[in-house]
């Protein structure tokens, strides 16, 4: 019982202590909010309103002032009283230990203080701007009026440089003068904010006019003097070149100059209407056009030099290529008496011949036009370059065809010599096989030997045809060469097999009397070797039989054969 009482007392003390601590924290927060409220109340809103109220206000300025004063009245009559009530509520809830309710009230107070502070900032900021704008307007209006007076004086002293734009500039200045009068009127009436807007607009407009007055004289100088002079110089240069024999009708300069004059008139209207950006763009574009015409004239002068330098050499090239083409035609006629010339090959010559005729015709037409002065030198230059390029192609194609014709005789002689060489190669191969003293030749080899002879016969027969078809000769020639290679390979293989069979049987004889199976298989191998001449099969049977008796024996025999060691010396 005693311990229960002690525990209860401890709990009560803890609760009272916790309540005291929480209560203290809430009072601390309420005091902070109270201090913030007092600081807001001390802000000089009423003093600033009184200062502005002393000014003479009208229009937009008066409406703004009334809105600020109405906003302050709302703060004084509603927002601050509401704030006091919520502060009192927070204190009462704290005294009664209603800490949750106290916290809610404190949060509401913070939000209310934010609203009041924001509203007061707007009022004070607006009042300050109004007071500053009055002072700033006074300073800037003086500077603006002085600048305006300078512009007026400049127009009076330099107006002659503005040409036909002068009335438009003066009209702009008159509009600004009226705006400045409106500024004075609004200032006298107390509408300082609207007056300030007018000052800002006038300042910007004066900057625009000042910049325009700087640009107008140079643009008028371009449209009235520089561009017309450039066009006159261009026309003079054009006419001088025409007198010297240049054909320049393709430029249509009279039409183009008329068009450019219309462009100048349009640019001048743009300047008078103060559309200076478009005028400047037009001036730049027209200068570029004139430069292009000069480039064209310069190109014609360069082209004339090229034509005079290259006309005769091109004529010489044409004559030389004509001579080459005629000689090639004679060569074709001669070759066709001996050799068959394919239609495709003749088509190549006919095509190049047609190209040459076209180039010759184009050159003759060009020469006539140059003599009569009816072609621009630039066009003549292009035509000469095209003819020269065509002649280079024609020359290469005809040289290639001529070389192919010359190679026909060379290829014929080589084919005849090679046919003889292949016959000698067969005889040499036959003698080599005779020296080997083979038991006989198998049917397969005899068939290849016969086919080889027929291939050479076919080639030699083809070489006797008139006219000689070298494409067919080349085909028969290739077949004969392939057959000779195949026959030689077969002969070498057969002789190799014969030597190996003899070595294997000779080595196997050491086991022949002791091994009946080996002896029987060796007899079978010998039958193939001596009777039907199947040397490869005989080798396979003999090797298989020997390997059954002595594994690896064939490798030893092969090694001894390659090293030219006697079979009897193999261990």
Curated annotation (Swiss-Prot):
The keyword Electron transport does not apply. Residues 23-571 are cytoplasmic. The chain crosses the membrane at residues 4-22. Residues 1-3 are extracellular. Its main location: membrane. It is found in: Cell membrane. It is a single-pass membrane protein. Keywords: Cell cycle, Cell division, Cell membrane, Coiled coil, Membrane, Septation, Transmembrane, Transmembrane helix. GO terms for cellular component: plasma membrane; septin ring. It holds the Pfam family EzrA. Residues 102-147, 248-298, 326-374, 400-437, 478-529 form a coiled coil. GO terms for biological process: division septum assembly; septin ring assembly. Negative regulator of FtsZ ring formation; modulates the frequency and position of FtsZ ring formation. Inhibits FtsZ ring formation at polar sites. Interacts either with FtsZ or with one of its binding partners to promote depolymerization. NCBIfam families: PRK04778.1-2. Belongs to the EzrA family. This is Septation ring formation regulator EzrA.
């Amino acid at each position: 019982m005693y311990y229960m009482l002690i525990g209860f007392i401890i709990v009560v003390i803890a609760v009272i202590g916790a309540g005291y601590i929480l209560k203290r924290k809430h009072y601390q927060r309420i005091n902070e909010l109270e201090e913030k409220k007092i600081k807001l109340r001390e802000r000089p809103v009423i003093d600033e309103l009184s200062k502005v109220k002393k000014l003479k206000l009208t229009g937009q300025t008066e409406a703004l002032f009334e809105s600020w004063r109405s906003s302050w009245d709302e703060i004084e009559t509603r927002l601050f009283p509401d704030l006091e009530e919520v502060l009192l509520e927070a204190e009462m809830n704290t005294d009664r230990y209603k800490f949750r309710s106290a916290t809610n009230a404190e949060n509401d107070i913070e939000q209310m203080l934010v609203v009041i502070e924001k509203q007061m900032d707007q009022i004070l900021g607006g009042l300050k701007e109004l007071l500053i704008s009055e002072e700033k307007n006074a300073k800037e209006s003086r500077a603006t009026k002085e600048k305006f007076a300078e512009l007026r004086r400049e127009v009076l002293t330099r107006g002659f440089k503005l040409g036909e734009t002068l009335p438009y500039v003066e009209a702009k200045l008159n509009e600004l003068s009226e705006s400045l009068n409106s500024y004075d009127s609004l200032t006298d009436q107390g509408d300082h904010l609207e007056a300030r807007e007018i000052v800002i607009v006038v300042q910007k407009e004066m900057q625009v006019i000042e910049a325009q007055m700087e640009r107008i004289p140079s643009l008028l100088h371009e449209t009235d003097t520089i561009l017309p002079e450039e066009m006159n110089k261009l026309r003079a240069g054009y006419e001088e070149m025409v007198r010297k024999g240049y054909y320049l009708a393709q430029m249509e300069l009279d039409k183009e100059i008329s068009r450019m004059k219309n462009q100048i008139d349009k640019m001048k209207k743009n300047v008078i209407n103060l559309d200076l950006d478009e005028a400047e763009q037009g001036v730049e574009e027209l200068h570029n056009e004139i430069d292009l015409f000069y480039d064209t004239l310069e190109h014609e002068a360069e082209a004339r030099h090229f034509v005079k330098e290259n006309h005769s050499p091109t004529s010489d090239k044409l004559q030389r290529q004509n001579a080459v083409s005629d000689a090639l035609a004679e060569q074709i006629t001669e070759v066709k008496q001996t050799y068959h010339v394919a239609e495709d090959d003749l088509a190549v010559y006919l095509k190049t011949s047609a190209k040459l005729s076209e180039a010759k015709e184009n050159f003759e037409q060009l020469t006539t036009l140059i003599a009569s002065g009816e072609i621009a030198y630039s066009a003549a230059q292009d035509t000469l370059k095209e003819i020269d390029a065509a002649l280079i192609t024609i020359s290469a194609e005809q040289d290639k065809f001529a070389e192919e014709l010359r190679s026909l005789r060379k290829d014929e002689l080589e084919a005849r010599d090679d046919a003889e060489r292949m016959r000698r190669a067969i005889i040499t191969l036959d003698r080599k096989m005779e020296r080997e003293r083979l038991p006989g030749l198998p049917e397969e080899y005899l068939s290849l030997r016969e086919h080889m002879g027929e291939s050479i016969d076919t080639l030699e027969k083809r070489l006797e045809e008139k006219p000689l078809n070298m494409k067919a000769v080349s085909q028969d020639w290739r077949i004969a060469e392939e057959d000779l290679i195949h026959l030689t390979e077969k002969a070498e293989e057969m002789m190799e097999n014969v030597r190996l069979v003899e070595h294997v049987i000779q080595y196997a004889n050491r086991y022949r009397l002791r091994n009946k199976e080996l002896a029987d298989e060796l007899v079978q191998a010998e039958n193939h070797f001596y009777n039907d001449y199947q040397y490869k099969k005989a080798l396979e049977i003999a090797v298989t039989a020997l390997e059954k008796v002595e594994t690896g024996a064939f490798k030893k025999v092969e090694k001894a054969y390659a090293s030219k060691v006697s079979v009897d010396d193999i261990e």
